[in-house]
């Protein structure tokens, strides 16, 4: 599994200021760390490779048990995914680093569906609104060929990938905005993001 992560200062720009009093880079790191925590706990994932040039992300990834690959292309998400997937010999997948409510069981279900249903083609999972993509898989011998970005669900379909269809709300709920974060909170955030959300809430008066 390839997990690309931007430098924290440049990541998740639409979330800037979403949690009053919480530094933006801390929130971006928490989203990635909780995503990575769930991916590493998924029994269907044999290896996790984080592609990043951010020192804090790299340290957190190594501490969690993932491999780290420098983002040598330094040319955006798709280039980072291609770079990370380049040496794969078997099944390979890429996931966005902004699904902090992710449950390992849901990721397992999606990966098994990709492998067991139409296993010779690339598969992708749209995000909750249905326009973006949170997960892309490729079978042995097929390039991952990522098309992440605005309208990526249509772009992946146009490239020949087939959509996955399953009940995986925590996997599909990526977080780009404060409203997305609130919805992920209702699903149940991972520990690092949950702690920051709690810290960013206004204190309730005793009266």
Feature locations, PLM:
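Short glycine-enriched, charge-decorated loop/helix-capping segments at active-site entrances
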Residues: 15-23
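N-terminal nucleotide-binding beta1-loop-alpha1 segment
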Residues: 1-16
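The conserved acidic donor/metal-binding loop of glycosyltransferases
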Residues: 96-100
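Short phosphate-binding loop-to-helix
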Residues: 60-93, 152-155
